[in-house]
């Protein structure tokens, strides 16, 4: 007879669906192939399909080894129309097979804390995971932890419609700081989105992130006068944590002034299971120290941030760093417009000759760090020293920063860079 849903369905299994949209039912038989589904159909039987082939579909956001999905009211509220997992199903992918054992218990959102994957860079639940907990009966205010999440892809005009503040009785207390640890106002999980944050984000919680970006090819626009303040210790105003080809247009205020606060943190992070098990970064994928030839499958075959643009109206303040780039994260270009306010070190630990890079990628990826515009019109005031602008930062990127001073600039700090090209009046005041 094989396996089936015996006895009763608990609050979790009662929300399970297969890739054909069939809901789990008591006594329903579980099969492994579509051919078995069709055979059962001819006999008037509805069966539950759980494939065990583990075939990867390019562009999927899960490497789960099964094809089961969790659906519920709260989950639907969070993921909306997102198609997730191998099969592009509107539900949370669940790992079905544990070797030859039918498991159907582990959430398989990419890289998540609750997944059963060998590489994870979350220290807290995703909003979809919290929604799942609500659907199985837990009662709490999910919005204390997440303001918004984008699980859908190809949204070309996503606009925020509220900020992130303290909560009471299920409502935002506008203007009051949210004290929740690990809180995130906006999480972009998916790909090919253009998202504009135009409402304030106020957090005082430890290890919070105002905005977190994963996925690939996402563009984030922080609107003029928008405040993203994460004042708790070890917090980030903006965290770019996974993927490739992201673009940032920063016109607002990013501030992270607690202990070791980082305004813009660009970092894949460490594997919560240990880096010796599996390690990921830009153009880097290692298993047990050995390079893997599957970068595209895991959205690692590109620059993490294509362009980081701090525009003239922007303010970027961090107690540890205004901009921090980890040794596993490649940023192609940083443009800091004249008069942009920057307070806090600009740090890059990326090394184009990182030993974890495969040989074909070594000595190829440097970061252009541009202060001011490179246009001839903007440099017409070359001799007008009253146009000099000040940046309060040490610039620390000896291995990879190619720094261009395109406008009159007083750097109130030191510069340790790979290359310096001065096209205007440049002063070091550190």
Placement of each model-derived feature along the sequence:
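Short domain-boundary/entry signatures in modular proteins, especially
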Residues: 141-153, 401-415
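Generic intrinsically disordered, low-complexity segments enriched for polar/acidic and small residues
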Residues: 14, 45, 53, 66, ...
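Alpha-helical hinge/cap motifs
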Residues: 2-3, 232
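Broad hydrophobic/π-residue packing in well-ordered secondary structure
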Residues: 7, 138-142, 217, 417, ...
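Surface-exposed loop/turn motifs in large extracellular/passenger domains
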Residues: 158, 162-208, 212-343, 350-383, ...
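Extracellular zinc-dependent metalloprotease catalytic-domain scaffold
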Residues: 3-160
């Amino acid at each position: 007879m094989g396996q089936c849903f015996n006895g009763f369905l608990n609050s979790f299994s009662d929300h399970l669906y297969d890739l054909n949209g069939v809901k789990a039912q008591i006594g329903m038989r579980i099969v492994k192939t579509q051919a078995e589904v069709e055979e059962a159909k001819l006999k008037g039987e509805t069966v539950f399909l759980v494939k065990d082939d583990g075939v990867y579909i390019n562009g999927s956001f899960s490497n789960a080894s099964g094809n089961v999905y969790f659906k519920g009211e709260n989950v639907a509220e969070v993921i909306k129309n997102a198609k997730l997992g191998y099969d592009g199903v509107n539900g949370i992918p669940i790992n079905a097979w544990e070797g030859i054992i039918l498991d159907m218990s582990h959430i398989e959102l990419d890289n998540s804390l609750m997944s059963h994957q060998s590489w994870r860079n979350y220290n807290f639940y995703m909003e979809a995971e919290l929604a799942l907990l609500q659907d199985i009966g837990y009662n709490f205010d999910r919005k204390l932890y997440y303001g918004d999440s984008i699980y859908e892809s190809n949204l070309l005009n996503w606009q925020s419609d509220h900020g992130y503040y303290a909560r009471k009785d299920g409502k935002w207390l506008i203007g009051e700081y949210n004290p929740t640890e690990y809180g995130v106002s906006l999480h972009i999980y998916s790909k090919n989105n253009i998202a504009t944050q135009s409402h304030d984000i106020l957090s005082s919680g430890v290890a919070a992130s105002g905005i977190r970006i994963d996925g690939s090819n996402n563009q984030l626009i922080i609107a003029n006068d928008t405040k993203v303040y994460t004042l708790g210790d070890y917090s980030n105003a903006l965290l770019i944590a996974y993927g490739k080809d992201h673009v940032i247009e920063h016109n607002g205020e990013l501030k992270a002034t607690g202990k070791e606060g980082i305004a813009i943190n660009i970092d894949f992070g460490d594997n919560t299971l240990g880096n010796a098990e599996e390690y990921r970064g830009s153009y880097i994928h290692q298993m047990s120290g050995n390079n893997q030839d599957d970068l595209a499958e895991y959205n690692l075959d590109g620059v993490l941030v294509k362009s980081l643009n701090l525009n003239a109206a922007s303010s970027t303040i961090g107690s540890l760093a205004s901009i921090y780039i980890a040794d596993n994260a490649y940023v192609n270009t940083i443009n800091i417009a004249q008069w942009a306010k920057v307070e806090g070190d600009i740090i890059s630990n990326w090394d184009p000759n990182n030993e974890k890079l495969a040989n074909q990628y070594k000595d190829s990826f440097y970061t252009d760090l541009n202060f001011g515009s490179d246009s001839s019109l903007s440099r017409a005031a070359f001799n007008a020293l009253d146009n000099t602008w000040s940046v309060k930062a040490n610039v620390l990127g000896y291995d990879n920063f190619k720094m261009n001073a395109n406008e009159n600039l007083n750097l109130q700090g030191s510069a340790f860079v790979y290359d310096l090209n001065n096209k205007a009046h440049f002063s070091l005041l550190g």
